Amino acid sequence: TELAARISSYQLAARMQLSVPEVTDLSTEKASTLKAYGADDATNPIKAGFAKNCILARRLLEKGVRFVQLFNGAYQTGGEGVSNWDGHKVLHQQYAKHGPVLDQPAAALLRDLKQRGLLKDTLVVWCTEFGRMPTFQKGASGRDHNPEGFTAWLAGAGVKRGHTYGATDAFGWKAEKDVATVYDFHATILHLLGLNHKRLTYYHNGFERRLTDVHGHVIKDVLA
């Protein structure tokens, strides 16, 4: 009944809120786990903060949360052009700061998920909004956006291990081998989640559009 459905939804909301303090309490984590992630790194509080977020992501997955998003790269680390990955300026300073923040915690998260048996049922999607140009940006010490060639990677449920798909030209500017679009990437993710992207349609401006616009194909070569 409608009443039962309402009661159930309120009960779910209550359980979600009541479980938050337990899930977010990292004091129950072993010292070895904190060290593995870099969450105890007093010399780099930004890295330690991201590491704690990675641990929290694992804890949410352990509680059955279906979707977890981690964000890296918007920190006050040196002013304009240095506080994120958007490398239009002072790229050498920028990536020297952000690389160490990301590297250890991200690797530790994958290892931890695997050791706990969670990775086989978890799809990890690691990506950005753009690649960077192989040349320096005019009038600046960084590199402009490059929509023609960039890297994303998948790990975990349903994908091949150690497999590379596609490549850019020798200059690093444009994808030329096994070219995949963002729509193909999304179609593949949806497939791994058990969804047929071609059936998720809605009518708009004369087209049956979908989450992959009006095109996109599953990249079968990356599937396990």
Predicted features and spans:
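Ligand-binding pockets and gating/stacking loops
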Residues: 1-224
